[in-house]
A protein has these predicted regions:
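A substrate-engagement module of RecA-like helicase motors
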Residues: 110-139
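Active-site flanking residues adjacent to catalytic metal/cofactor-binding acidic residues
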Residues: 98, 229, 257-259
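Short regulatory helix/loop adjacent to the ATP-binding pocket of P-loop NTPases
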Residues: 109, 263-277
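Conserved catalytic network of the ASCE P-loop NTPase/AAA+ motor domain
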Residues: 54-56, 88-90, 219-221, 246-249
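P-loop NTPase Walker
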Residues: 1-114
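Accessory N-terminal region flanking or inserted into the helicase ATPase core
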Residues: 1-34, 38, 42-43, 60-62, ...
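Active-site signature of alpha/beta-hydrolase-fold catalytic machinery across serine-
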Residues: 46-50, 206, 245
Length: 277
């Protein structure tokens, strides 16, 4: 197994100075600014290989992406780098590299058997779910706000639901400000539970909330030593809360994002910066 702990050792693997610096950075929170073609996947792969070569169990590594296609790409890149560094490609099966929604589904299912009975709705299936229950959810009452346009009303209701769940807003406060919208959101929540469906926004919100209060969820998350997140500029409020809690439980956090000035840190933790482009 070749040593790949230092920047010079990583440079010898063919990484640029910027990539090597990011892969070797041992800070507990690192933001890697990356643009197209800057080699972010290569940097992620070598960072994973580095921490494994230094003794981190593969089971303690979680890499979050936002699409299955991106997850597959990173898995292939990591496997190639592991072999190049004299490590086994089979380690891929011991770590988690995948979407944040699948990760949350695994965490919830392990912590509470009831969630294994739920059918997960991606965004498209959630839209179809709302369409199938349009009359009984009181959505018709909102149509006059959107000139009686069915699909625009539906899209706005789904957007309101996602904001409500992503940002952890209070349903009581929404109801006090806008009773019609509040009632629709409350009905959606009750129907989803009754029908044993879990939409993407609710899945992450449930995981983020339980990560703060549920001992079994916290125990599961505390086993993570290194968390890597791709496309960090796109995370929602609930996703950021979950990432922050995992960091508070002891994991280092390495995130890759574009040059977005809104990315500065979370809940008191500020990023060290690496620049790939």
């Amino acid at each position: 197994m070749r040593k790949i702990s230092t920047e010079n050792e990583l440079r010898a693997e063919g990484l640029t100075a910027e990539q090597a610096a990011a892969a070797a950075d041992t800070s507990s929170t690192v933001l890697c600014i990356a643009c197209a073609g800057s080699g972010k996947s290569q940097t992620l792969a070598y960072r994973i290989a580095r921490v494994i070569s230094e003794g981190t169990p593969a089971t303690a590594i979680v890499a979050i992406t936002f699409t299955e296609k991106a997850a597959d790409s990173i898995k292939r890149r990591v496997a190639k780098v592991l072999v190049r560094c004299g490590l086994s490609a089979n380690l891929i099966g011991q770590m988690y590299i995948g979407t944040i929604h699948a990760f949350c589904q695994n965490v919830l299912g392990d912590s509470d058997a009831i969630f294994r009975q739920y059918d997960v709705l991606d965004d498209n299936r959630f839209t179809l779910y709302l369409m199938s229950r349009y009359p009984e959810l009181g959505i018709n009452a909102l149509k006059p706000r959107f000139k009686d346009r069915y699909f625009e009303t539906l899209a706005q209701v789904q957007h309101a639901w996602n904001v409500y769940r992503d940002e952890g807003l209070s349903l009581k406060e929404i109801e006090s400000r806008d009773p019609q919208v509040g009632n629709v959101l409350k009905d959606i929540g009750q129907r989803l539970i009754r029908d044993q469906f879990l939409d993407f926004s609710s899945m992450v919100r449930e995981t983020a909330d339980r990560a703060r209060t549920d001992a079994s969820v916290r125990a599961r998350l505390s086993r993570i030593q290194h968390l890597l997140v791709d496309e960090y500029q796109d995370v929602s409020g609930s996703q950021e809360e979950l990432i922050a809690t995992i960091h508070e439980l002891g994991a280092s956090v390495f995130v890759v994002g574009d040059d977005d000035q809104s990315i500065y840190g979370f809940r008191g933790a500020r990023f060290e910066y690496s620049q790939l482009c």
